[in-house]
Amino acid sequence: MMTYNKKYIDSVEYDLIETRKRMWMMERKKNEELLKKYQQAMSDLEDYKNLYMRQRSEMENYQRYIEKTINNIKANANADLIKTMLPVLDSLDAGILHDEKLKPIRSQLIKILSNYGLKEIESRGKKFDPYLNEVVGIVKGDDDIVVEEVQKGYILNNEVLRTSKVIVSKGGNNEQDNRN
């Protein structure tokens, strides 16, 4: 009977060992599957994180683009409106030559327009600047000095809106008038 029991015990022990091996193999296989799923989930998470960061960056760039576009539209709308006001300023300048009472009106209009970025180009007595001035006449005198402004020029938000039409002195030349 001992041999039978030993065989039985050996058999049970063998089954137990085999069952443990199978369980260990199943756990190992399950752990490997879980590890693969975990690694895939982490990879997917990284992909989604990168996608989110790209989308966020694109959205921020789009918002900056929209803000810039809106500012450009506002600036251009102001520029168009102010350009239409320049002939009014020219008329006031011409009127001031005949009636000094128009000076406060012109000053008030210039003050309002300066709130929108308009600045007058000061040219008289200064060296000629081709970016700010347009020569309409030349007289004898010191080289490249603006002696008279025929028409005021204006700068809007650091861009030339209209150049000043000026008469410039040139050394040794006879007086010429090239007005258009």
Swiss-Prot record:
Keywords: Chaperone, Cytoplasm, Stress response
The protein's assembly and partners: Homodimer.
InterPro entries: GrpE (IPR000740), GrpE_coiled_coil (IPR013805), GrpE_head (IPR009012)
A biological process from GO: protein folding
PANTHER family: GRPE PROTEIN, GRPE PROTEIN HOMOLOG, MITOCHONDRIAL
Its biological purpose: Participates actively in the response to hyperosmotic and heat shock by preventing the aggregation of stress-denatured proteins, in association with DnaK and GrpE. It is the nucleotide exchange factor for DnaK and may function as a thermosensor. Unfolded proteins bind initially to DnaJ; upon interaction with the DnaJ-bound protein, DnaK hydrolyzes its bound ATP, resulting in the formation of a stable complex. GrpE releases ADP from DnaK; ATP binding to DnaK triggers the release of the substrate protein, thus completing the reaction cycle.
Protein name, UniProt field: Protein GrpE
Family as reported in the entry's similarity comment: Belongs to the GrpE family.
Database matches in HAMAP family: GrpE (MF_01151)
GO molecular function terms attached to this record: adenyl-nucleotide exchange factor activity; protein homodimerization activity; protein-folding chaperone binding; unfolded protein binding
Main localization (coarse): cytoplasm
Signal peptide positions (record): none
Gene Ontology CC entries for this record: cytoplasm
Cell compartment(s), UniProt: Cytoplasm
